[in-house]
Amino acid sequence: MSDWTAFLKQELQQAYMQQTLDYVAKRRSEGVAVYPPKDQVFSAFTATQLSDIRVVILGQDPYHGEGQAHGLCFSVLPEVKKLPPSLKNIYKELASDINDFVIPTHGYLQSWAEQGVFLLNTVLTVEQGQAHSHKHLGWEQFTDKVITHINTHCEGVIFILWGAHAQKKGKGIDSARQHILAGPHPSPLSAHRGFFGCRHFSATNALLQSQGKTPINWQV
């Protein structure tokens, strides 16, 4: 059983989340393509146990192209051939930051999640072709609670906050208990403003090693 179970059970029963889930279900029943598929909306919580979290990467909302999103931020399913631009830029930075990192031909980041990298989007659903279409439905409140829960129950976690959206979201993180790495978003619009060269991946591993923890193998 996941150690997220009690938290999820309690939070998903709250009135605001019932409204969110009802709206998403209604849109699906009307024939609207909502991503990720229903059984993958909470994939981040099954991929990474609370007690295993060592790193948190915050995204915005899921990819809105067909067959891409599967519940882990920035990640796409293995069969996706055309990688999203932000993920390509993440790989470029990894190649310059981490010795021997080979840029993959796929964008499936499940192995990061299995090593304790919690890949959380701020908003957990989106409609096809409509970025931010499920903004302000209640997901933001839910993911605020998730971050607070991690902040309370874990220590020494490295929060990677790319872009103003993630940095605003991370304002409540206790920097005395956790580590924060902040910088521009990897999207093509901002990657050249300081995302390239941020070296957040090697910095994360240095922070983990300073705590006596195993570094992340970023190769996927």
UniProtKB/Swiss-Prot annotation:
InterPro entries: UDG_fam1, Ura-DNA_Glyclase_AS, Uracil-DNA_glycosylase-like, Uracil-DNA_glycosylase-like_sf. It is found in: Cytoplasm. It catalyses: Hydrolyzes single-stranded DNA or mismatched double-stranded DNA and polynucleotides, releasing free uracil. The active site is at D61. GO terms for cellular component: cytoplasm. Coiled coil: none annotated. SMART domains: UDG (SM00986), UreE_C (SM00987). Its main location: cytoplasm. It comes from the Bacteria. Its EC number is 3.2.2.27. The keyword Cytoplasm applies. CDD domains: UDG-F1-like. The keyword Hydrolase applies. It is an enzyme of class 3 (hydrolase). Keywords: Cytoplasm, DNA damage, DNA repair, Hydrolase. NCBIfam families: PRK05254.1-1 (NF003588), PRK05254.1-2 (NF003589), PRK05254.1-4 (NF003591), PRK05254.1-5 (NF003592), ung (TIGR00628). Belongs to the uracil-DNA glycosylase (UDG) superfamily. UNG family. This is Uracil-DNA glycosylase. The gene is ung.
